[in-house]
Structure formats: structure tokens, C-alpha cells
């Protein structure tokens, strides 16, 4: 695999950088309604210092769905958007590998290569911003930190320890000038390394973080965005046939609502009918059988809370179609349901 990826993308050093920051979204053409939803929410942001948003789609430019082009046209009134596609060879390689980490690495690398600013914010496709000043706050944190990498959450797992001071990629603000001067795009890809007798699986960008002069952690309140992590990677593995998630938890049932938010209600209605049966352990999603038996009641409750938080932020209440969809979540959450029962800044009301 590394032989295929090593020279798949390249970049040049960044000279005469523009002021401000660039927001980057690595998107999937198969999830076009989610792309639409994210763009619309990004357009609601206070983006005074945003130079542009670079949207990278995982297909050649002439195959980008019309729904994405329409959303770009709609949102361009509020922010500058540049759309990039893959070359035919990049598309061939990624389709052959069908691995989420390859798609994200390639798309991020392409965007970093095209950025006109030093500051680049990696905005996950499945992270939906609620707080209108999110991007500006992330940029301020990066400026104040003076770090090459400024993240909002510590990375843990795969042999990585807290002492390494590494941060996750989602909502990560980074110095594109530093990366383009010191590294090749392939250096950002996942790496296995033996360190002090331990095998460490460095996720995307972690190995170059380890070599940086300074990285910083600036946490933000979870209420500023709705981010059911790994939705895109889970969807890639599911569609590729690598898993049906039997006996495993997942966030794929956030997708029907995300599609609804992006103007496609068909999946929401289809899954709503399938969730009517409380004890049903599989459903049909994206043409494949998906197991739900590994989702714990507490996680059904958490997903309901995230959907309602986003729905209330967008329209002020839960629309009837969404409330009907969430009925299946409520049945499965049982006594673990938190909506309407909590108090405090992270509480979500039952409306």
C-alpha cells in the first residue's frame, strides 16, 4: 500500500502566505447530503478572517454530485469556497484500497498543498458546528499557542501516551507552511514505529507531530459542535463490506438525520420504519445489512441527545419527522435516556 501512496500527492513550499486561515473538509461523494449539511452550517459561522474553505471530494471533478455543486453555489454568498477533486489515478488507488484513512490523508494533503494561508483548520465532515464563532476561536487558539499543531482533544490509544502530547486531527489547527517546508505529504500518513520497546501505531499526522517543535491542546466545550466521531470511517468500512458491526457499537444511525439535514429525507423515513420493532437487531442501510445489537442503551441515549442538540440549534425544535425517527432511539435507551432529564450547560430539552 505504501508504494501506491508514496507519490500520490505532492506540494511545494508556501511563500508569501495570505493572512487569516483556511478551513478544510475532506468529503465523500457518496455522502453528498452530509456535505450539504456541513457546508450550510459552516456558512452560518462568523468567518471574518477565513481566507477560504477548501472542499476536497473523493472523485474526479467531473463526477462531483450536482447536489454538492448546488450547495457550494448557495453557500458562496457567505464564504469563499474552492472545490477540489481527485485525479483519475488518485481515484483509482483510493477505490482499490477503500480505506477511510487513505481518503482522509489524501484529501487533507491536497487541501494543505493548495492552501494560501499558513493556518489550516481540519474540519471533519461528520463534525457539525453549532457555535457561530467556532472557527474564529480555533484560529485564535492557534495564534496564541504559537504551536505547529493546536488541537482540541488529546490523542489516546494505539500505544500513544499522554506524555507524547499529541492531539487528534478533528478541528485541528496546523501550520501548513511548516508542513510544506519540512515534510512530504506521505510523511503525514499512518506510521508503525518501535519506540522504547513499544510498538506505536501513529494515526494520520501523529508522526509528524512527534517531530514538531511545539504542539498545544486547547479544549473547547462539546456543546459548540455535534461530532459523533468516526462516522465517515465506519461508513467506509461498512460500504466496503469489511464489517456489519455485529456485536459492536457505532454511530452510523446518525447518518439518516445528517442526510435529512442536507435535504435528503428518504433514508430517515426508511430507517424510522425499521426501528419501529424494538427487538430488531439488524436494519438495511445503504443497501447492506447493518447490526444494531452492539449499541448499548446509553449510546442510543447519547445519539438522541446529539441529534436533538443539532436540530434545536438549526430550527429551534425537533421537527415531526425527526421526533418520529428518534422514537426508536428512546425505546432502546430506556432508563438511560438523558434528554429532558439533565440540568446544566450540556443539557438538552425534550422539544
Regions found by a protein language model. Give the residues of each.
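A conserved hydrophobic helix/loop-capping motif in glycosyltransferases and polysaccharide synthases
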Residues: 21-31, 45, 56-58
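Short, well-formed alpha-helical segments that are part of the catalytic scaffolds
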Residues: 31-46, 67
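Active-site-proximal specificity loops/subdomain of glycosyltransferases
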Residues: 63-114
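Short aromatic/hydrophobic "clamp" motif used to bind/position activated sugar donors
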Residues: 120
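The conserved acidic donor/metal-binding loop of glycosyltransferases
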Residues: 124-128
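Conserved donor-nucleotide/metal-binding helix-loop-beta segment in metal-dependent transferases, i.e.
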Residues: 132-158
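Catalytic core and acceptor-binding pocket of nucleotide-sugar-dependent glycosyltransferases
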Residues: 171-274
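Terminal low-complexity segments of carbohydrate-biosynthetic enzymes
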Residues: 267-351
